[in-house]
Amino acid sequence: MDTAELTRLADCPAPAKLNLFLHVIGRRPDGYHLLQTAFRLLDWGDALSFELRHDGVVARATDLPGVSAEHDLVVRAARLLQSYTGCRLGADIRVDKRLPMGGGLGGGSSDAATTLIALNRLWRTGVRGEELTALGLRLGADVPFFIFGRDAFAEGVGDELRPLDLPPAWYVVVAPPVTVPTVEIFAAGELTRDTEPIKITDFAASTTRNDLQAVACSRYPEIGAAIDWLAQFAPARMTGSGACVFAQVASEDDAERIVASCPGSYRAWKARSVMQHPLRGWVG
């Protein structure tokens, strides 16, 4: 379709991510943490729709509970693209929110990345991939990964990305009944920030960990309980700063069986890895 004809982009995927491991290896003078992590994309996530406006207004067609428009990453992403390009067009944005908030699955960051990618297309602003990635970093450390659009080994504050070739896999993701503020975990005095850096060739789930997990579990025991429950079936750990935990399983049948046995106090989903972001072809 000629982009000149576009007035609407519907059901644009904003996939979840897993941190297969997450090491905190230092802290910059400006307070940002230096990380090493392996990002993995999943076939499960939010979906966003964008309707072109000619009055320059960016409006949410759906509210996000507890989040004002000024603090909504989707709205901020749209306005950032407007400001950066001088675009006078606007958009009505609808978010079908499927990922749990405060879960460590990158939902807000993924929504922001999809907004930048989709509106760059809808508005025909012509921002190239590297510039779009730099804009994403201004919104959050995880946003560049979703614009990068494939499994990655990440360093720096999460913005130094290298492709990571991983075999396909099935996962079970479990959400305990808590929401974890990322800032709280990274600001914790007990968080260790001196893990020895590893090389990309050394990456293996058996020799890595999530440095944020112990802090999150001490403050939110429900996370530790969810890990213990899931670990009955396969090695389990937390993703991101929590609260969701995950385990890799052998097959879709195994994933479905575990999800079906999930206690009522938790929510559980099956998810499959994907080779690349569904919108990667839109990033120039």
From Swiss-Prot:
UniProt GO MF annotations: 4-(cytidine 5'-diphospho)-2-C-methyl-D-erythritol kinase activity; ATP binding
Signal peptide: none
Enzyme Commission designation: 2.7.1.148
Residues where ATP binds: 100-110
Catalytic center residues: 17, 142
Keywords for this protein: ATP-binding, Isoprene biosynthesis, Kinase, Nucleotide-binding, Transferase
Catalyzed reaction equations: 4-CDP-2-C-methyl-D-erythritol + ATP = 4-CDP-2-C-methyl-D-erythritol 2-phosphate + ADP + H(+)
Pfam families tied to this protein: GHMP_kinases_C, GHMP_kinases_N
Gene3D superfamilies on file: 3.30.230.10, GHMP kinase, C-terminal domain (3.30.70.890)
The UniProt record lists the keyword Kinase: yes
Pathway it works in: Isoprenoid biosynthesis; isopentenyl diphosphate biosynthesis via DXP pathway; isopentenyl diphosphate from 1-deoxy-D-xylulose 5-phosphate: step 3/6
One GO BP annotation of this record: isopentenyl diphosphate biosynthetic process, methylerythritol 4-phosphate pathway
Keyword hit for ATP-binding: yes
Family: Belongs to the GHMP kinase family. IspE subfamily.
UniProt xrefs under NCBIfam families: ispE (TIGR00154)
Function: Catalyzes the phosphorylation of the position 2 hydroxy group of 4-diphosphocytidyl-2C-methyl-D-erythritol.
Protein name (database record): 4-diphosphocytidyl-2-C-methyl-D-erythritol kinase
Name of the coding gene: ispE
